[in-house]
Every structure is written in C-alpha cells, then in structure tokens.
Regions:
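Short coil turns that delineate tetratricopeptide repeat
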Residues: 68, 109, 143, 176-177, ...
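N-terminal leader/linker segments that initiate helical-solenoid repeat arrays
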Residues: 28-113, 133, 399
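Start-of-helix register in tetratricopeptide repeats
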Residues: 72, 79, 113, 147, ...
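Residue-level recognition of tetratricopeptide repeat
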Residues: 79, 86, 120, 154, ...
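Canonical tetratricopeptide repeat
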Residues: 76, 117, 151, 184-185, ...
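Single-residue signature of alpha-solenoid repeat helices
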Residues: 56, 97, 131, 165, ...
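Canonical positions in the second alpha-helix
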Residues: 63, 100-104, 137-138, 171-172, ...
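Structural motif corresponding to the intra-repeat A-B loop/turn of tetratricopeptide repeats
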Residues: 84, 88-91, 125, 159, ...
Length: 402
C-alpha cells in the first residue's frame, strides 16, 4: 500500500492526541532527550527542506533563541515538537518541547497554558501523578478547559480508573461537540463491556458531525476498528482500519493497531510494506521485527538487535517507559519468558490498558504461572472487557493446574 501523506503538526485536536496516547504513546517510548544547553543543535527534522512545517519550526526556534521567555513562542514550539513526536514516534522531540518550556517548568503555579502543556509532557515520561496534579490545578482554575479534561480522561483510562474517566468525559458535555463527547465516552465504554452499543453511538455521532479533518477521521475509524475486534468482527475491523489508513496523514497509533491486527490474523507479509519506513519508532520497529521473524526475512536479525540495543540503552539510563513493549520483545523475539513476565508484571503496576493485560496474560501462560497474572485476570472480569482473544488467553491460563 502506498499513499501520499502529510505531517500534521499543531493541528490535531487535543482529545485525539489524548486518547491516542492512551492507546500507545503513554506506553511505548524511550526517554526523551533534553538538551543541557540552549545552543545544542537538535535534529534535522524528517521533513523536506521546503516543507512549511520545517520553515515554521526554524522560525520558532529563532524567535525563542532571541527571547527565551516569550511564552507564546515557547508554547507554539513545544506544541509543534509534541505533534511531531506523535506523528513520527521519535521521543526526542518531547525533550525538545520540554526544553522550550524551561523558564516555566519548575514553577509551582505557571500560567494556565504552560501548566497544561507541562502536564502533557509529564505524562509522556510516565509522571502520571505529577501530570494529574497539574491537570487538577488547571481544571480548578478553568473548569471549561477541554484540553485538561481530555488529558485527565486519557490518564485515568490508562490506569483503569474508569469512574473518574467517566466524570472527566461528562465534564466535556457543555464544552465540546457531540462527536467530541461521544468519542470520549466510547473510548471508555468500548473498554468496559459495551463495545456494540458504543460502536453504534460513535458511528452515529460521526455521521451527524458532517465534514471532518483527516485527523478526526483517523481517530474515529481506528476506535471503530478496535471496537469491532472486541465484538469479534474482524471483517468490519479491517474495513475501518483500511479506511483510516488511506487518509493522507501519518498516524503511528493507527499503524501500530493495524499491524497488530494483521499479525493476529496471520498476515505478517502485509506488515512489512506497512512499516518498512518506520524503523525510528520503537513501537513500529517491534511490530516490523515480529513480522520479519514470522517470515524468516533477512532483516529480522538486524532489527531484533536494534531493538535489543535500544532496550539495553534504556536500562542503563534507568528508563522504565517501555516495559510492555520490552516484555513483548523478550517473549516473542528472543524467547526470554522469565524476563518477559517480570517486565509485564512491573508494567501492570503503572498501566492497565487492554494491551498491558494481554502481554501479562501471555507471559504468565508461557511460564504456566496463573498466579503471576491474577491482577490482570481480576481486571478482565471487573472491567467486563470483551476482546475474544484476551478472554481465550485468560481461559487457558485459568485452566492450568496450580
């Protein structure tokens, strides 16, 4: 598949970022690089020299260099870097965003716009407590701040605080559009046993909303695909994934979800052309390597070693931001079941999304140790999550003799 794509920098609605990050970005990146000096040359952006995005970033960097305390410029630059990190899967851009906010980063009560941006960057580094403190302060100061409520919902979802997430979504009712609110509630209810009803609700809200940007279309279609899978409808899921894929934007969250679908369907040959140009992104390189190993492709060993090097470097830094992905790497690419289980258990302490449960259940099954995944088994029953594959794995795990 090939399609001309664009980079969407600074245009993606915050709720789309928030819920997309709840799916992948919160769980999967290496630590962002933060320059120690303002004069450090960062990275040549992966866009064409004449691209308007590159021109805007150069201009913003020049403006901020001339006046580092100009908050409007700093925030615009941080936003652009953060959006680029989302589009490209390169966490270094989050470090650059944090560097742009340096004058406000350690203030106890920064201005509202800087406070919310700081929270967004904190959650990226898994400082969920710090991020929620900032977001709580933001919603106290401005109860109609949709951005802060959206990110609160995203973090509450990642940590399986479903009632709090529902309250966050409901706070958006008089602030944002019907599609906005439907998307928030569908993300919650689609995880907690109401996939069919919320598929209908989100589909109807999407149809009523009229013309939407490619970003909104991709987000909604990806969520509809995920809900289709939870209903056991692979055909419908693929239709939604493909419709999202052919929107003319880069979206690594869609690519990761679509690649997982293809891998689960036993179609690794379709994953390679999908992800071959995405080796900079850890989450996508992992899926590419899984496909290559399944096909015994020549690049598999190279990409497995690249991932091993990245995970080893993260361990030396004390970086624990990507334990779910590292667990999957250990279990399926290098066969270290013990380490996979330990990583999956450690990851579950902080993150309790369906994919976090999946790797914990699968690692425990590989080790024939149901007790090791008891918390994930309890979550599955308590949440009512419907995914047939997850429930089948749980059933196999429960069937093991103690």
């Amino acid at each position: 598949m090939s399609i001309i794509r664009t980079y969407t920098i600074g245009t993606v609605t915050d709720w789309l970022r928030a819920f997309a990050l709840a799916s992948f970005a919160i769980t999967a990146y290496a630590a962002p690089y933060i320059p120690k000096e303002d004069s450090v040359v960062l990275e040549h952006l992966p866009v064409r020299p004449g691209d308007p995005v590159a021109r805007e970033l150069r201009q913003l960097r020049a403006e901020l260099s001339a006046n580092p305390r100009k908050r409007d410029t700093a925030l615009r630059l941080a936003e652009r870097y953060f959006a680029l990190a989302n589009a490209e899967g390169d966490p270094r851009y989050v470090g650059y965003a944090q560097a742009a906010l340096k004058p406000w980063w350690d203030l106890p009560a920064p201005p509202l716009d800087a406070l919310v941006m700081r929270a967004i960057l904190k959650q990226y580094s898994h400082d969920f407590y710090g991020a929620m403190q900032d977001l709580a302060a933001a919603t106290r100061e401005d109860p109609r701040n949709a951005r802060a409520w959206s990110w609160r919902a995203a973090i509450d979802m990642v940590q399986a605080r479903y009632e709090q997430a529902r309250n966050d979504c409901l706070a958006l009712r008089n602030i944002q559009s019907d599609l906005y609110v439907a998307g928030c509630i569908a993300y919650l209810d689609g995880t907690t046993g109401k996939a069919a009803a919320d598929y209908r609700a989100l589909s109807e809200a999407f149809a009523r909303s009229g013309e939407n940007s490619p970003e909104i279309k991709v987000w909604v279609l990806t969520r509809l695909a995920e809900m289709s899978l939870r209903m056991g409808n692979a055909k419908q899921a693929e239709e939604n994934f493909r419709a999202a894929y052919f929107e003319p934007i880069n979206d690594q969250f869609l690519l990761a979800a679509y690649a997982d679908f293809l891998l689960d369907q036993g179609r690794p040959d379709e994953v390679i052309p999908l992800l071959v140009d995405w080796v900079r992104s850890d989450i996508l390189l992992l899926r590419l390597a899984l496909a290559e190993k399944a096909l015994k492709a020549s690049k598999a060993a190279e990409h497995i070693e690249a991932l091993r090097s990245r995970f080893d470097a993260a361990a030396l830094r004390g970086d624990k931001l990507h334990q779910q992905e590292e667990a999957r790497f250990n279990l399926y690419l290098i066969g270290n079941k013990e380490k996979a289980l330990a990583l999956a258990q450690e990851n579950w302490k902080l993150q309790r999304e369906p994919r976090d449960a999946r790797i914990l259940l699968e690692a425990a099954l590989a080790m024939k140790n149901p007790a090791a995944a008891q918390e994930a088994l309890d979550w599955l029953e308590r949440s009512g999550h419907e995914d047939p594959g997850l429930r089948a794995t749980a059933q196999r795990l429960r069937a093991l003799k103690p």
